[in-house]
């Protein structure tokens, strides 16, 4: 019960504070900046692997059937 009450009080406090007060604005700007870099790195990593798979798919011609 104490945890629930504490959680609710902190949530109410966080929701009532405006982004310009107490440096919250700079915190959110920095978090967004970091998020953009992390997202770009993850996307680059994912697409890098995907391009290698596409290259292999082009190298192997699916129209050619070889029986050994």
UniProtKB/Swiss-Prot annotation:
Provide the leader sequence positions.
Answer: 1-22
Q: Please tell me whether the keyword Secreted is annotated for this protein.
A: yes
> Where does the record say this protein resides?
Secreted
GO term, biological process aspect, one:
defense response to bacterium
Q: Which GO terms describe its cellular component?
A: extracellular region
- How would you summarize where this protein is expressed among tissues? Goblet cells.
Protein task: Antimicrobial peptide with potent activity against Gram-positive and Gram-negative bacteria. Activity against E.coli and B.subtilis. Weaker activity against L.mucor, s.marcescens and P.aeruginosa. May play a role in innate host defense.
Q: What is this protein called?
A: Pleurocidin
